[in-house]
Amino acid sequence: DLYKIAEICRDKGVKSYLTVNTVIYDEDMTLMRSVIDAAQKAQISAIIASDVAAMTYANEIGVEVHLSTQLNISNAEALRFIALAMWSYWQRAEYGSGTYNPRDHRQGHICGPKGHPVRIEMFAHGALCMAVSGKCYLSLHEHNTSANRGACAQICRRGYTVKDSGLELDIENQYIMSPKDLKTIHFINKMMDAGVRVFKIEGRARGPEYVYTVCRCYKEAIEAYCNGTYDEESIGRWDEQLATVFNRGFWDGYYLGQRLGEWTHRYGSGRTRQKTYVGKGIKYFSRLGVAEFEIESGELHIGDEIVITGPTTGVIIQKVEEIRYELQTVEKATKGQRISIPVKEKVRPSDKLYRFDKREE
């Protein structure tokens, strides 16, 4: 899939990144190099790495490296050290050893391999690790699957009973190790003013409507700040939209000086709506702007909000304005029927059709 994904990204003018940020042991070196070689061949924009071995090899073969939060850099001097090391590796690969003098660095700047100031990337939205992306061993201890090797079993997301010396403690919330999700859209202006140039969104294992909604909201927020239209009304609208997709509740993280974390009060998502599978795409009539679907589960009504997803189609979100069954306009469609509805974009065979429903607490 790597080559196909990279090709799609290039065709759409989107950068692609590959995470190679697990703990790497000696026996992993061959695999690590083959993965980075594949990233280079596929023309992936950059890898995200935390192990020095991965960063060194990527620099040697000319693959751009972004430092992962797993590297646990917490001060400017640590960042300067990594930046100088990567510059040295790059210079050695380009011009041979002994050509770089650290004193040539401009004072006050932390520069990357090609001499440009290092860009600061920060997470802006999404799930948070209770270990702050550190070396967590809960999953390894309980299930022998290492969170540091890409196999976290999400042990921290469960509810727990707290005991001390045999006494059970009365606590307000049983999810004592499951943080709420990060949300910064209401102070994205402060992050931009601070010099952040790349915003990262945690979206692993999330549905396409999550990626679509969250990326769109933050893109609108950044553009609004740049053109002077960033205001409370817009923030309220984005907040409502972000609440409709997967979340465990939201908080500001530690960005604004908060010293204690905020923990979720539920297992799973707190989104305000959920998607229900309805059917699959059959055909699209481009001249009419109409798509044919086969209803495979439940019902579809006029006025329902739907999402259509597919590997090529991406995400289409809209309301059902009309339903036609056997050339007749109907109020609803039921399982087994082949129906047509107006759709603003092309739908492809086997695209999945979902209905958005208000989530029951």
Curated annotation (Swiss-Prot):
E.C. number: 3.4.-.-
Pfam families in alphabetical order: Peptidase_U32
Enzyme class, UniProt record, top EC level: hydrolase
Keywords, sorted A to Z: Hydrolase, Protease, Virulence
GO molecular function annotations of the record: peptidase activity
Cofactor(s) this protein cannot do without: a metal cation
Disulfide partners: none
Keyword Hydrolase recorded: yes
PROSITE patterns assigned to the protein according to its UniProt record, in alphabetical order: PEPTIDASE_U32
UniProt KW Transcription regulation keyword: no
Modes of activity regulation: Activity somewhat enhanced by calcium ions, inhibited by zinc and Fe(3+) ions and by p-chloromercuribenzoic acid and EDTA. Activity is enhanced by salivary peptide cystatin and reduced by salivary peptide histatin.
GO biological process, one term: biosynthetic process
Family the UniProt entry places it in: Belongs to the peptidase U32 family.
Function: Has collagenase activity. Active on soluble collagen, reconstituted type I collagen, heat denatured type I collagen and azocoll, but not gelatin or the synthetic bacterial collagenase substrate PZ-PLGPA. May play a role in virulence.
Subunit structure: Homodimer.
Protein name: Collagenase
Organism: Porphyromonas gingivalis (Bacteroides gingivalis)
